[in-house]
Amino acid sequence: MFRRFATTALFTTLIMTKPVHAQGITKDHHDGARFKNPWPSFVSYGFIDAFKMLTGSDKSVMSAAKPTDMPEKVDINWNLLKEKDDCKLHATWLGHACIFLQMKGFNVLLDPVFSDRCSPVQFAGPKRYTDPPCKLEELPKIDAVIISHNHYDHLDVDTIKKLSTAHPNCKFYVPLGNKAWFNLSRPLDSEGNDRVIELDWWESANIKNDTGELKFTCTPCQHFSGRGLMDRNKTLWASWCIESVTGVAKVFFGGDTGYRTVPIKTKPELQYDVDYLDTLPHCPAFKEIGEKIGPFDLALIPIGAYSPRWFMSPIHCSPEDAVELHRDIKSKHSIGIHWGTFVLTDEPVFEPPKRLKAAMERRGLDVEDFNVLPLGGTFSISI
């Protein structure tokens, strides 16, 4: 399965062409040409490392078979999705990292991907083994779309085009450098793409309507970007914080992130050992987010696509990492995302929620404070 991830990535880089990126001043996370993860918790691996993994003695075995086990799926509660209740916060899981968030009179869609494959083409690349719980056209009015980064399983041109047509007043919030993709790919129907708001880490933008106002803050995470051969890390990746301006409710969206790097030669029995993992450098950004913006009423944290651990750990949380992130940002309740939709890596389909439950128990935490939703399921809290 890891070979599927690696070969798809290679295929993707070969067919894409013109890079898009931001020309910015030098910062800790930007050298003026490319973005970077400015922490000891990140180690960069490339195609040479992937090739070694594919051809080495411990290479992964790829199976093209569709998983036989499926995540639980429920019918969407459309009455809930269409209600206007300023005192409730609703989050509905639509598959992978996509969440339909209802908060203070706003409908916000996070990392929407409704295509059959997360790929530059629809005849090759990772194919979803669980269908979305609804059609994109069935969703209520969308006020805002938030994108975490430009990988194909988080930014899908066909989905963006459909959203643009169906919701002409919708705004798109993206990390620095990604507005250029909208100009190049032209997924929106408006000239100049003034509907796209581009932010750097720790920059914020507000959205208002007749009932209230939300603040979107682009915050750090540990990942990378790229849709083609020449554009690796030329656009920024981000987590996001969504707040009501009155401070009544706060939501964290992790998008796609790593937490620490498990060294290549780590023994298999130590790769998920909490005592050993605690000795490794971890990304300090999440504690900073917790201190500056937290605590959060709800956090949406990735828990899947983490094996083989040495290769995926810098960019993808394991469930054990996700629990530490949950604690760092001071989340009152968290939902696991980024699993149960595409087979991208080696771990069994149902392993992420099982490991998540075990990791919560190991830390002495209430397993109900960080769990997963069924596909189409909604988590609701009063705010």
Model-identified regions with their sequence ranges:
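Metallo-beta-lactamase
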Residues: 2-138, 243-255, 297-298, 304
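Active-site neighborhood of phospho(di)ester-bond hydrolases with catalytic His/Asp-centered motifs
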Residues: 109-111, 141-151, 173-175, 252-257, ...
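Active-site metal-binding motif and surrounding structural segment of the metallo-beta-lactamase
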Residues: 123-174, 291-300
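Short amphipathic alpha-helix with an adjacent loop that forms part of the alpha/beta core around
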Residues: 133-141, 205-212, 217, 286-292
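Long, hydrophobic, well-ordered secondary-structure blocks that form the structural core
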Residues: 143-144, 149, 158-207
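Active-site environment of divalent metal-dependent phosphoester hydrolases
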Residues: 151-155, 179-182, 203-206, 224-226, ...
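Active-site-proximal loop/helix segments of hydrolase catalytic cores
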Residues: 158, 225-329
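Binuclear metal-ion centers of metallo-dependent hydrolases, dominated by the metallo-beta-lactamase
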Residues: 186-211, 290-292, 307-383
